[in-house]
């Protein structure tokens, strides 16, 4: 029974946090019932996830650049709401029929707002997220932060295998071993990413 109750609480938090993040690059929640015997929510049906497209080499360079911009916009909005996603990876980026890519899966989101829900639903010492996208400090039980999401975004950009020398320094700065050497915010990542292409076009 305790496990069922924990699942219900986690599910509720996931839906509430995701519904708070209304943005064109975040999967929207249209309707939900969090108090039903079997809680549920309704969202758009995605065509596929980014991991599938990367694995099957389905993306052009222009598409990859556009996807990075959309992911950065979505994650920046999550952070602006005072949340940490904590599970950014290609599998959690979904493509929809209009060609838009949206960040999904708020199951591990943490609310950092002072008045936020501080209930711990995961045992102390349990590491969350996927190992490849997990910042090094998390392996030593450090606190999650904006910079742990920055690290994960850097790994996601790396996965897209953009054959462009301008991108490598951005990936390197996102994924520094020491978090203090990484970008301070997702907006900083976006600024360098966008301007690296503007400089090349001028």
Which stretches of residues belong to each language-model region?
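Short beta-strand micro-motifs within the conserved protein kinase catalytic domain, predominantly
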Residues: 28-39
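Conserved catalytic-loop aspartate of Hanks-type protein kinases
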Residues: 149
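Activation segment signature within eukaryotic-like protein kinase domains
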Residues: 67-68
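Conserved activation segment of eukaryotic-like protein kinases, specifically the C-terminal portion
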Residues: 121-137
């Amino acid at each position: 029974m305790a496990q069922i109750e924990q699942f219900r609480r986690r599910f509720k938090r996931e839906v509430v946090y995701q519904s708070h993040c209304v943005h064109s690059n975040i999967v929207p929640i249209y309707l939900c019932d969090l108090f039903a015997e079997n809680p549920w929510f309704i969202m758009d049906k995605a065509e596929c996830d980014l991991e599938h497209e990367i694995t099957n080499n389905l993306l052009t360079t222009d598409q990859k650049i556009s996807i990075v911009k959309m992911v950065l916009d979505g994650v920046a909005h999550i952070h602006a709401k005072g949340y940490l996603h904590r599970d950014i990876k290609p599998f959690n980026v979904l493509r929809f029929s209009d060609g838009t890519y949206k960040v999904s899966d708020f199951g591990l989101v943490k609310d950092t707002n002072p008045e936020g829900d501080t209930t711990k639903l995961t045992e102390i010492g349990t590491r969350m997220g996927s190992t490849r996208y997990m910042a090094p400090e998390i392996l030593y039980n450090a606190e999650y932060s904006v910079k742990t999401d920055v690290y994960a975004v850097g790994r996601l950009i790396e996965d897209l295998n953009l054959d462009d020398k301008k991108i490598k320094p951005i990936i390197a700065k996102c994924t520094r071993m020491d978090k203090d050497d990484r970008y301070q915010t997702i907006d900083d990542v976006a600024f360098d990413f966008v301007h690296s292409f503007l400089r090349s076009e001028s």
